[in-house]
Amino acid sequence: MPKMKTKSSAKKRFKITATGKIKVAAAGKRHGMIKRSNKFIRDARGTMILAEPDAKKVIHCYLPNGL
């Protein structure tokens, strides 16, 4: 049976840290910033670490062989 391929879209969206956690960009910043609070814009500026249940799903479904 052949190896599962890593999804190309996942390669572009996720980074795996040295400890095995998954780093992603914060969601909700594509458009509509006028109606967002300044706190939301500040908090969504950088990257965030996915929660453990979500990270397991991402690794199992989209990144079977890592990046």
Swiss-Prot record:
GO terms for molecular function: structural constituent of ribosome. PROSITE patterns: RIBOSOMAL_L35 (PS00936). Keywords: Ribonucleoprotein, Ribosomal protein. GO terms for biological process: translation. InterPro entries: Ribosomal_bL35 (IPR001706), Ribosomal_bL35-like (IPR021137), Ribosomal_bL35_CS (IPR018265), Ribosomal_bL35_sf (IPR037229). GO terms for cellular component: cytosolic large ribosomal subunit. The keyword Ribonucleoprotein applies. Transmembrane segments: none annotated. The keyword Repeat does not apply. PANTHER family: 54S RIBOSOMAL PROTEIN BL35M, LARGE RIBOSOMAL SUBUNIT PROTEIN BL35M. Belongs to the bacterial ribosomal protein bL35 family. This is Large ribosomal subunit protein bL35. The lineage of its organism: Bacteria, Pseudomonadati, Pseudomonadota, Alphaproteobacteria, Hyphomicrobiales. The gene is rpmI.
